[in-house]
């Protein structure tokens, strides 16, 4: 009698483990379809977003090797110190807003988005000062003075784009966490189509040269934020989740920071390890060639990583929604479906990259040495792509569960205690140069993927669903108890 009563009161579905038989009852296929319908347009969104930086590098790169190297350095530095940090902080919404939407606390999404914008804008103030003095800092760090000076000028013109990014990232997650991908898709495609001619005009016709690329990137980020903000304000699709600007946005600052800091640590520790490789390449003999080649490899990896990142975004959203709704079994099935998609994507894209390795360098540069070096690096980039596809989805699972702090510990150990030391040893002591740097990154990614897989296998999904419900009850100011949440 007591057990029956507790079962009625407990809104979380009880499931021991998802077995192979469970995956054959139609739930797996249905979840696979949901993920594909979410991830396919989301992949286009991620690709067009990442292509803004890549197109900028391509257009600037044809001005010459110095322009490509300085723009690469500037974008790498700005990614490390600004864009990655802002994106990482905003990832807190993957847990908070995703679970709030699953719990049908729709208005919380708008409030949380405004809270994130406020916090991220404040963060941009000290970061902009750092960017303004980037050229001097790079010289102090021992970088080539000519590259450092031009990179500093490029970064200064990217400062307006940083503030736009602080608005753009919460808006992106506001739409993503309620599975409204169409506004993101339309906006990203429009901005991309505008960015290409805008960047070309500012670089080649305005007399700004490579500085025009930075200005074009900043303007495109602002256009992106304005378009999404307008859709949020005017569209009827956002009527339930839209919230007015009130003092309530300041009440959620502490909760946002609680999840934002570990989210930022998780993302940044991985992102920074790749960017650190670019900075280390500037200390190698022939720094212009090494920096240009590794920057091309990193941008290629970023572009091809768009599909697994979209799958990870879909998995994170679906898991957080299901946990917020108390559906632990459905959340568990999402993991199997997402990993299946990631494996297929890794094999297809990795094979395609190897097949086109001789053409890859020509997209970014007309310098023969750069083109040949990029072709030599392509097999290593393919291995990185396969590993990133797997760990990307596993990281998405951690975000959906609110386990970003565990992901941060894993990324720190895998890259900074293992991968980066191996990279430095191979590059400077074994004299493998850029190849050695990338092998070290692969070693870190292998350990990262194994540890994330181990953690995912140990998740108790029933407990995760119960914790999500408790979190939503607290967010609802305890006006509703855990069992009274409006599912």
UniProtKB/Swiss-Prot annotation:
Protein name according to UniProt: Protein DETOXIFICATION 11
- What family does the entry list? Belongs to the multi antimicrobial extrusion (MATE) (TC 2.A.66.1) family.
Keywords attached to this Swiss-Prot or TrEMBL record, sorted alphabetically, are: Membrane, Transmembrane, Transmembrane helix, Transport
Q: Where are the transmembrane segments?
A: 35-55, 73-93, 122-142, 151-171, 184-204, 211-231, 264-284, 293-313, 330-350, 377-397, 412-432, 435-455
Pfam families with a match to the protein in the record: MatE (PF01554)
| Top-level lineage group | Eukaryota
What GO molecular function annotations does the UniProt record carry, in alphabetical order?
A: antiporter activity; xenobiotic transmembrane transporter activity
Q: For this UniProt entry, what's an example GO CC term?
A: membrane
Protein localization: Membrane
Entry membrane topology: Multi-pass membrane protein
Q: Which cysteines are joined by disulfide bonds?
A: none
Tell me which Gene Ontology terms the entry assigns under biological process: xenobiotic detoxification by transmembrane export across the plasma membrane
């Amino acid at each position: 009698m007591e057990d029956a009563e507790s079962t009625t009161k407990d809104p979380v579905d009880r499931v021991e483990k998802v077995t192979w038989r469970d995956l054959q009852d139609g739930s797996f296929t249905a979840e696979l379809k949901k993920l594909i319908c979410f991830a396919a347009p989301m992949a286009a969104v991620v690709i067009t977003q990442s292509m803004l930086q890549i197109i900028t590098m391509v257009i600037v790169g044809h001005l010459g090797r110095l322009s490509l190297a300085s723009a690469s350095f500037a974008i790498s530095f700005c990614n490390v110190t600004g864009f990655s940090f802002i994106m990482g902080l905003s990832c807190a919404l993957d847990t908070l807003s995703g679970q709030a939407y699953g719990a049908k606390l729709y208005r919380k999404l708008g409030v949380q988005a405004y809270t994130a914008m406020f916090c991220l804008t404040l963060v941009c103030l000290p970061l902009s000062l750092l960017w303004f003095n980037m050229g001097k800092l790079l010289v102090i760090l021992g970088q080539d003075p000519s590259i450092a000076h031009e990179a500093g000028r490029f970064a200064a013109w990217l400062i307006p784009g940083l503030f736009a990014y602080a608005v753009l990232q919460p808006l992106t997650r506001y739409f993503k966490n309620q599975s409204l991908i169409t506004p993101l898709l339309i906006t990203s495609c429009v901005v991309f189509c505008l960015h290409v001619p805008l960047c070309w005009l500012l670089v080649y016709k305005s007399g700004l040269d490579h500085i025009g690329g930075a200005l074009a990137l900043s303007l495109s980020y602002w256009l992106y934020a304005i378009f999404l903000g307008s859709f949020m304000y005017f569209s009827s699709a956002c009527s339930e989740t839209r919230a007015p600007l009130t003092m309530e946005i300041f009440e959620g600052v502490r909760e946002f920071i609680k999840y934002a800091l570990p989210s930022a640590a998780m993302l940044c520790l991985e992102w920074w390890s790749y960017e650190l490789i670019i900075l280390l390449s500037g200390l190698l003999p022939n720094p212009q060639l090494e920096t240009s080649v590794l920057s091309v490899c990193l941008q290629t990896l970023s572009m091809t990583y768009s599909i697994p990142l979209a799958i990870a975004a879909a998995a994170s959203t679906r898991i957080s929604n299901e946990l917020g709704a108390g559906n632990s079994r459905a959340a568990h099935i999402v993991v199997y479906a997402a990993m299946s998609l990631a494996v297929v994507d890794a094999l297809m894209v990795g094979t395609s990259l190897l097949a086109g390795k001789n053409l890859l360098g020509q997209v970014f540069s007309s310098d023969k040495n750069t083109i040949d070096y990029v072709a030599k690096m392509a097999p290593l980039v393919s291995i990185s792509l396969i590993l990133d596809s797997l760990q990307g989805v596993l990281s998405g699972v951690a975000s959906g569960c609110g386990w970003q702090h565990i992901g941060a510990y894993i990324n720190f150990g895998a890259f900074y205690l293992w991968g980066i030391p191996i990279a430095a040893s191979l590059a400077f002591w074994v004299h493998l140069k850029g190849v050695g740097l990338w092998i070290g990154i692969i070693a870190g990614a292998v350990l990262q993927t194994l540890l994330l897989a181990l953690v995912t296998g140990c998740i108790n999904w029933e407990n995760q669903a119960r914790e999500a419900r408790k979190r939503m009850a607290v967010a609802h100011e305890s006006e509703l108890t855990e069992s009274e949440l409006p599912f």
